Amino acid sequence: MRADLDALVIGAGPAGSAAAIGLGQAGWRVRIVEQHAFPRRKVCGESLSAAGIELLDALGVGAAWRAAAGPELDRVGWMSRDAQVIAPFPSCAQGRYRVGRALGRERLDALLLERARALGATIEQPARIRAVTGRPGLYRCLLESAGGHREWIATRVVIAAHGSWGPEPDFGSPGTGRGAPERPGDLFAFKANFRDADPGRGVLSVIAFAGGYGGIVEADDGRTTLACCIRRDALAECRREFPGIGAGPAVESALRRECGGLRRALARARREGPWLAVGPIRPGVRVAEPLARGLAGVFRVGNAAGESHPLIGEGITMALHAAALLSRRLAGEPPGMIDEARARAMQEGYALDWREAFSTRLRVAAAYSQLAMRPLLAGPAGAALRLWPGLLTEAARLADKARPAGLPPPLHEEPA
């Protein structure tokens, strides 16, 4: 059996589509399998840093994204029970852009997927990959369409961009622990969009509350995005306090009660669409798991590879950055030459690249999340920020919000 494809990408979020674009620019034959029809809303804070915007330029969608995105985010905010602080956002000293902006995922994901299609990728949507078997250079993947039709397709490598909380295909090797026992500290993520809210133009605010953290920002078309993560035990308490209204509205009610700044921001707001929820989320590093499981030709990207606590709002930028790192590693070898040894070497190099790029962000995000979720820490932090607002600017800088993309010259770059 010969490979029909050079790369099969599982998942058409920012990471999967960006990887497909990068490989398409290098002339690879790529197929993307996405389980949901587009456009679709997604649980996400929806902001993108200056580095992320530059990565979109390299992918060929920067101009379209900038034309649709919300205002420049030149200020950073902190909201808690007793404090509301705003400070200048740290500016990126290198590259074309100084600060980030926000755009809804239903628009971003569609832009990236259509760009991948324009570069020759074939799209199966909605569809799933149920099983993967084989070896680097020749994997057989069981594709199931929405109507239930099944077929086997052959590919040289697999790119797993299916996220971190949903089911993964059967790779014929021990799993990743997604069925771990429930714990009180498990985090569930929620998101809603609002009209007529007032989060402050150009302000990306962090929300600190007992048992969770969140963020609020003005995105495209005047919409406001509110997203948060809440511990399992705190969510259960919310539902007891606000029974009969659903998990999302219960969380919103608790946030309004706990946080004066958020209450003021949403005073005249009306929610657009239902609350969305996913989880439990899985902050941590998983980029090297395929190699440990004997899957040298299966490369993880996006949240499947690893994720930071969402508090720092770097998920999309990290996804695009990781996709660029991976596509450059893969495109360095002719696809027809990929075998076990070459795939293993690329896996090891990519994992090193990934850790070098993101390890600091993950550690800082983990520390910030604990500070925000614990009132005994968040209270003093809010008091300190009121006295010295510049600490908020430096905290954002420490979370790499002003870090340039720092990639080699792209395979293709969109004109400014």
Language-model regions: role of each:
Residues 2-15:
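Beta1/beta-strand and adjacent pyrophosphate-binding region of the FAD-binding site
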Residues 15, 38, 165:
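Conserved Rossmann-like nucleotide-cofactor binding loop
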Residues 24-44:
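Glycine-rich FAD pyrophosphate-binding loop
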Residues 37-57:
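Conserved N-terminal glycine-rich FAD pyrophosphate-binding loop of Rossmann-like flavoproteins
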Residues 53, 57-110:
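A conserved beta-strand/loop capping segment in the N-terminal third of enzymes
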Residues 115-265:
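Predominantly flavin-linked oxidoreductase catalytic cores and closely associated redox partners
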Residues 240-330, 335:
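FAD/FMN-dependent oxidoreductases across multiple families
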Residues 328-416:
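C-terminal helical "tail/cap" subdomain of flavin- and related membrane-associated enzymes
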